[in-house]
Amino acid sequence: MSASVSKVVVVFSGGQDSTTCLIQALTQYDEVHGITFDYGQRHREEIDVAKSLAQRLNITSHKVMDVSLLNELAISALTRDAIPVSHELMENGLPNTFVPGRNILFLTLAGIYAYQLGAEAIITGVCETDFSGYPDCRHDFVRAMESALVQGMDKKLNIITPLMWLNKAQTWALADKYQQLDLVRHHTLTCYNGIVGDGCGDCPACHLRQRGLDDYLQNKSAVMASLTQAIETGKPQA
């Protein structure tokens, strides 16, 4: 992360991960601009949650962008109400909640928006350590997208991924480090069924979130120490 970065664009869904990234960014940068994408998602309540959180956290600006074309192109349990969310993997080894091209599109549009604003970096809450199995959450993908944006727009632009090498318990610890654990727990929306806070308790997103929270609450000191170590001496931050 460059010391010269002062203005950033956060890809902001209103969920646990992106909200934690937003909270951290507000302590590190002069201008924090959020961008939220409306793609006709199953859990589209997250858009209103993102609007509310952006106002509550007093970020520099918040833009909601209509990308409904993605809904037409990408068939997934998150873009089709008729497809139930499954706990089983598909034949290709991916969850049926995977939306093909979603992060390719989101990071491309965030890059264009960053160019327009004169921002030096994009922040996204993707994670390879403790994630849902999506290929577009991996470190190598993010680096490839960063390279494509830099070459395609002839502009220096970093994609920062603060959570890339953290597990879910450490992500909860990060929110707690900034004294925002309760806000993230009770006012974000991660649930695929659109239920704020602890969610439905049944979908894969809720299971992952709750397991991480339980791990953190049962081992606060150890997890916080591991978070500090991961930040200071862990794998290089993407």
Curated annotation (Swiss-Prot):
Residues at which ATP binds: 12-22
Cofactor: binding comment: Binds 1 zinc ion per subunit.
Protein residues bound to Zn(2+): 191, 200, 203, 206
First-level EC class: ligase
Family matches, as Pfam families: QueC (PF06508)
Keyword match Metal-binding: yes
Keyword line: ATP-binding, Ligase, Metal-binding, Nucleotide-binding, Queuosine biosynthesis, Zinc
Enzyme Commission number: 6.3.4.20
Pathway given in the UniProt record: Purine metabolism; 7-cyano-7-deazaguanine biosynthesis
Cofactor (UniProt): Zn(2+)
Job description of the protein: Catalyzes the ATP-dependent conversion of 7-carboxy-7-deazaguanine (CDG) to 7-cyano-7-deazaguanine (preQ(0)).
Family: Belongs to the QueC family.
HAMAP family documented for this protein: QueC
Name the UniProt record assigns to this protein: 7-cyano-7-deazaguanine synthase
Lineage: Bacteria, Pseudomonadati, Pseudomonadota, Gammaproteobacteria, Alteromonadales
